[in-house]
Swiss-Prot record:
Protein name according to UniProt: Succinylglutamate desuccinylase
Protein family: Belongs to the AspA/AstE family. Succinylglutamate desuccinylase subfamily.
Record note on cofactor: Binds 1 zinc ion per subunit.
Residues holding Zn(2+): H64, E67, H159
Keyword annotations of the record: Arginine metabolism, Hydrolase, Metal-binding, Zinc
Alphabetized Pfam families for the sequence: AstE_AspA_cat, AstE_AspA_hybrid
Length: 342
């Protein structure tokens, strides 16, 4: 397949399962070099040689194959870079995550890809997602491993959620053992992200892998509801899209943006068995608040009761496999977190 098809429509090319006749070249009138690294992996770099202070930015979507809006936004970003409509001021790796699931219109085929990073894919060798997790780890490691010493490293992993949310667009920051950075929180404010969830334990997500193993400022963005390809109102994603484009092009963030509210994970509901009962409505919104003493779950001898004056539930899902998380409980820590930004 001619490389022009890849560069004109990265999404359509990837869904078709083709490989380009040429795997690298120049675009944007010679100002940008591109390289196809494999299915759903497209790297860009300015042709100019002043690389010493150049940031390295990984932007991903489609880690869940049915989360189409961010995939469409990322394909448009690549198209505009190729055409020279968007200047490039960084090393950039564009990643479409779970390509087989995208083609099938499914969240995943065998296992949730966003639970298979940091080597966990080795525990499920028969899973059709396992090789992709290993490939994405290797691509991120190689990309950030080639970054100029001391330069900024970013990973923005874009998703949409299965359920509604009290805060329509929110972010999750992986646990790294250090406080969130002011750079990340201010960027999230510029993206008009209303809330940030801070993890307090290591995980197996893509953004956790790049934060821990690649030294990236990493976040997972939840940008709205899951919809089929072509049925998204992309205007609802405009603030986040603008912020990503500014990060890629070296543009300045708007001053005075409201910083997001911050919530910290204080517990989780773990599914012990198929007898798990979640005492919340099937369509309960993420970040719905519950008061002290409310029983939220029961599974045999296990019971989860709200311990703080107010706790909010995020990602409740009783249909996960036993042993996996069936919900997170968070509390508001905005004041303390923003005061401790570094």
């Amino acid at each position: 397949m001619p490389a022009a098809a890849l560069l004109d429509d990265f999404l359509a090319f990837t869904l078709a399962g083709d490989a380009p006749a040429e795997r690298d070249g120049a675009c944007a009138g010679g100002a940008v070099r591109w390289q196809w690294l494999g299915d759903g992996l497209l790297a860009f770099e300015p042709a100019a040689t002043d690389a010493a202070a150049r940031a390295s930015v990984l932007v991903s979507a489609g880690v869940h194959g049915d989360e189409t809006a961010p995939i469409e936004l990322l394909s448009m970003l690549a198209r505009d870079l190729v055409a020279g409509a968007l200047p490039l001021a960084c090393r950039l790796l564009v990643v479409l995550g779970n390509v087989p699931a995208m083609r099938a219109g499914e969240r995943y085929l065998d296992d949730d890809l966003n639970r298979l990073f940091s080597g966990r894919h080795a525990q499920v060798p028969a899973s059709r997602e396992a090789p992709r997790a290993a490939q994405l780890e290797a691509a991120a490691s190689a990309f950030f491993g080639a970054a100029p010493a001391g330069s900024a490293r970013w990973h923005i992993d874009m998703h949409t959620a299965i359920r509604a949310s009290v805060f329509e667009q929110f972010a999750l920051l992986p646990h790294t053992g250090t406080p969130p950075t002011r750079a990340m929180v201010e960027w999230l404010g510029d993206a008009r992200i209303a809330a940030v969830l801070l993890h307090t334990a290591k995980g197996n997500t893509y953004s956790h892998f790049t934060a821990e193993h690649c030294g990236a400022l990493a976040c997972t963005l939840e940008l709205g509801k899951v919809r089929p390809f072509g049925q998204n109102d992309l205007t609802r994603f405009a603030p986040a899209d603008r912020a990503v484009r500014k990060l890629v092009s070296g543009g300045r963030a708007e001053g005075g943006a409201t910083l997001p509210r911050v919530f910290t994970v204080i517990d989780q509901i773990t599914k012990q068995s198929d007898a798990l009962e979640l005492f919340v409505a099937a369509d309960v919104a993420n970040f719905t608040a519950f008061t002290r003493g409310t029983v939220l779950a029961q599974d045999g001898d296990y019971r989860y009761t709200v311990k703080h004056d107010e706790e909010r539930i995020v990602f409740p899902n009783p249909t996960v496999k036993p042993g996996l998380r069936a919900g997170l409980l968070v509390v508001d820590t905005t004041r303390d977190t923003l005061a401790a930004l570094v």
